[in-house]
Amino acid sequence: MSDRVVLAYSGGLDTSVAIGWIGEATGAEVVAVAVDVGQGGEDLETIRQRALDCGAVEAYVADARDEFASEYCMPALQANGLYMDSYPLVSAVSRPVIVKHLVAAAKKFGATTVAHGCTGKGNDQVRFEVGIQTLGPELKCIAPVRDLALTREKAITYAEQNDLPIETTKKNPFSIDQNVWGRAVETGFLEDIWNAPTKDVYDYTDDPTFPPAADEVVITFEKGIPVALDGKPVTPLQAIQEMNRRAGAQGVGRIDIVEDRLVGIKSREIYEAPGAMALIAAHRELENVTIEREQARFKKTVGQRWTELVYDGQWFSPLKKSLDVFIQDTQTYVNGDIRMELHAGRATVTGRRSNTGLYDFNLATYDEGDSFDQSNARGFIELFGMSSKVASRREQGLAGN
């Protein structure tokens, strides 16, 4: 039996050509694996059949949308995962679930190697290969674009010469990656960081300059997970999809950033994540109501480190798993409702309520009914400022000598 290579298959030109390209370069049989994480487009059966028509000996497709939303997007939400305070890990958080299915397929079909379509200068090569090495240490990895010199021009020529059932003439000027958590756009004229994005860059969001009437939504959370919208129960996937639709219609979630890549270069990226950004804003505000101050301060540090690990392809690392435990513990009391207005590119919190919150009206009010004993303040201030007072006394004494 020939060696087998499992290929992360998208159904597009590059990975369709890679089936035959890998076979000719290595002599191995290719098993195509397509994972649906909410990227839209063609249905899985069409993609599966194309892989077989392009020469794959097996084609495995998986609808991982619910799994992706529940087991990957929700932890990112609970961590308030925003890389460089801006990017909600759109691509980074999808790679581990794809890796999981690639490794499972390799074991199922007896493959010794996993192939992916990443270049040698992006983050995804690291995310895929570190994940594969972790879950399937016996597996080898190859990247046709990086390792077998498969350029787009060669891919077009190969497809035409071999009559592959794939479109070769239409070329999008951008490199696009998308899933239910968001959409990433790069390359083309965007590589000049002075160039403003044009309208054709965007797909998940409408122009916020001319928005429809404001849209008010109430998001209900249990343990940091959205469980209802406007009182209607939803799954995590449904929550993201509905918020994508509603926030996207208002132009919420457009991000334009020069990003520090893992491989050491800076890259200009355009992201659209209407649902993710609105949900993170709502979740963060509910945490303000429900999490104790010192715990909240430390969680921000933990969340930032968690985000960096996921961005860097360390989803399966021991440290990330340990941080998961802390973050999950902080979510115990993150229950309640957030009212939010979506309008003109902004998701603005206008109300919050929680039965497990730490906000005490009687302590906070300045009106009648105030139960805060202000006489305690003087002693607190004296003790709180003691160390600074003593240090200042020392400095003044030394200055006088």
From Swiss-Prot:
Its EC number is 6.3.4.5. Keywords: Amino-acid biosynthesis, Arginine biosynthesis, ATP-binding, Cytoplasm, Ligase, Nucleotide-binding. Pathway: Amino-acid biosynthesis; L-arginine biosynthesis; L-arginine from L-ornithine and carbamoyl phosphate: step 2/3. The keyword ATP-binding applies. GO terms for molecular function: argininosuccinate synthase activity; ATP binding. It comes from the Bacteria. GO terms for cellular component: cytoplasm. Its main location: cytoplasm. ATP binds at A8, Y9, S10, G11, G12, L13, D14, T15, S16, G117. It is found in: Cytoplasm. Signal peptide: none annotated. L-citrulline binds at Y87, N123, R127, S175, E259, Y271. L-aspartate binds at T119, N123, D124. One of its GO terms (biological process) is L-arginine biosynthetic process. It catalyses: L-citrulline + L-aspartate + ATP = 2-(N(omega)-L-arginino)succinate + AMP + diphosphate + H(+). InterPro entries: Arginosuc_syn_C, Arginosuc_syn_N, Arginosuc_synth, Arginosuc_synth_CS, Arginosuc_synth_type_1_subfam, AS_cat/multimer_dom_body, Rossmann-like_a/b/a_fold. It holds the Pfam family Arginosuc_synth. HAMAP family: Arg_succ_synth_type1. Homotetramer. Belongs to the argininosuccinate synthase family. Type 1 subfamily. This is Argininosuccinate synthase. It comes from Kocuria rhizophila (strain ATCC 9341 / DSM 348 / NBRC 103217 / DC2201). The lineage of its organism: Bacteria, Bacillati, Actinomycetota, Actinomycetes, Micrococcales. The gene is argG.
